[in-house]
Design a protein with these regions (language model features):
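Charged, flexible cofactor/metal-binding loops and thiol motifs
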Residues: 81-85, 98-105, 275-370
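Conserved ABC ATPase "signature" region
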Residues: 163-182, 291-295
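A short, proline-enriched helix->beta-strand linker immediately N-terminal to the Walker B motif
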Residues: 206-210
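Catalytic Walker B motif of ABC-type/P-loop ATPase nucleotide-binding domains
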Residues: 212-215
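P-loop NTP-binding/switch modules centered on Walker-like glycine-rich loops
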Residues: 221-305
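ABC-type ATPase nucleotide-binding domains, specifically the catalytic core motifs of the NBD
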Residues: 16-21, 62-65, 77-119, 146-163, ...
């Protein structure tokens, strides 16, 4: 029997407004995900697929209007299970015509007050986040040690400055920062990108959160440092058993760290299942988009043959003009005459094709059992 999820996202919708185009962008459009205690769920997809916006929505960090306009984000915290979007729907009203959003009326001030009340004691304490650019996430005017001490004193039972300092040094040591007592007094500008990312990881885990969100934690680092950060995250997962939501466009990172995977395209989840099953080379059932992503990744075989990588034809879906049918239809190379009408005119449900494996595609008849 599967454990009750620590994080359950249901029908999440997060939209933004484009002033140049005078239209709403459906960045996250009906996403449902769950993460079990101790599990790492990897979310993968091209830039613009909605991965990071999903993560930021879960952490309550979407600030641009209209932002999160609907859904449920349930977190099983140390105290109780709570819906982090509870009651927010009364502050939002969406108007649509012919499948296109014409207006979003939102009491932004009331929404923010309610959202901050819901996130009180959650952000930082129950949910911690590693950002893709550690230099911009760290305070440039404060030492690494001071930022760690502040986090520890705010979110843990540490008694006094001295105990918080020792805990901070302990975490710098755990993330493999050399000479942690000396680095404690360093400012971010005096540390490399990889070292800043290690400090960010230490800061996130020092509060002993229930859920860690890692948003592109290796982006912007050179290949050697990327590998070391991935090794570090893998080791910390073993040591702490932390539940993790991992965002990446790098499938090799997902393969290394994730227990389950969710593939996103055009603001929706198109495939989800155990990582070993979804990413297996011999997989018989796979969403065409997942297959295209895997085909674009270099392998020892393609390197040996010096063959070209397979690019995904076309452009990433513009989620302003969402098609009536499958969102990948315009780029899909597996459409047959038998399913073309469905692909063009009806969005497929996310249906179970095997135990724990779901695919949003008309190629698989089992999709009808969503």
């Amino acid at each position: 029997m599967m454990d009750a999820p620590l994080l359950a996202i249901e029908n999440l919708r997060t939209y933004f407004y484009s002033r140049p185009k005078r239209a709403f962008i459906r960045s996250v459009d009906g996403v449902s995900l769950h993460v079990a205690p101790g599990e790492t769920l990897g979310i993968v997809g091209e830039s613009g697929s909605g991965k990071s916006v999903t993560a930021l929505s879960a952490a309550g960090l979407v600030s641009a209007a209209p932002g999160v306009i609907g859904g449920r984000i349930e977190l099983r915290s140390r105290q109780a299970r709570r819906n982090l979007l509870d009651g927010l729907e009364r502050y939002v009203r969406v108007k649509e015509r012919d499948g296109r959003i014409t207006a979003v009326e939102k009491d932004d001030r009331g929404w923010r007050r309610r959202a901050e009340t819901l996130m009180e004691g959650v952000r930082g304490k129950e949910i911690a986040m590693i950002f893709q650019n550690p230099r911009s996430a760290l305070n440039p005017y404060s030492t690494i040690g001071a930022q760690l001490v502040e986090t520890i004193r705010l979110h843990t039972s540490a008694k006094g400055e001295g105990e918080a300092r020792e805990r901070a040094i302990h975490w710098l040591e755990r993330v493999r920062i050399d000479s942690p007592r000396l680095r404690f007094d360093n400012f971010p500008f005096g540390m490399s990108g990889g070292m800043c990312q290690r400090a960010m990881i230490a800061m996130a885990l020092s509060a002993e959160p229930s859920l860690l969100i890692a948003d592109e934690p290796t982006t912007g680092l050179d290949a050697t440092i990327q590998s070391r950060i991935v090794d570090l995250l893998a080791q910390l997962k073993i040591e702490t058993g932390i539940t993790t939501l991992l965002i990446s466009h790098d499938i090799s990172v997902i393969q290394r760290l994730a227990d389950r995977i969710a593939v996103m395209y055009g603001g929706t989840v198109v495939e989800t299942g155990r990582a070993a099953e979804v990413l297996a080379p011999q997989a018989q059932v796979r969403h065409p988009y997942t297959a295209a992503l895997l085909a674009s990744v270099p392998s020892p075989e393609t390197i040996r043959r010096k063959s070209y990588l397979q690019a995904i034809e076309g452009e990433v879906l513009d989620t302003i003009e969402v098609p009536r049918g499958c969102r990948f239809y315009g780029r899909c190379n597996r459409v047959t005459e038998a399913i073309r009408e469905n692909c063009a005119g009806r969005e497929p449900p996310l249906g179970e094709v095997a135990t724990g494996h779901k695919v949003r595609c008309w190629l698989y008849p089992a999709t009808g059992k969503a």
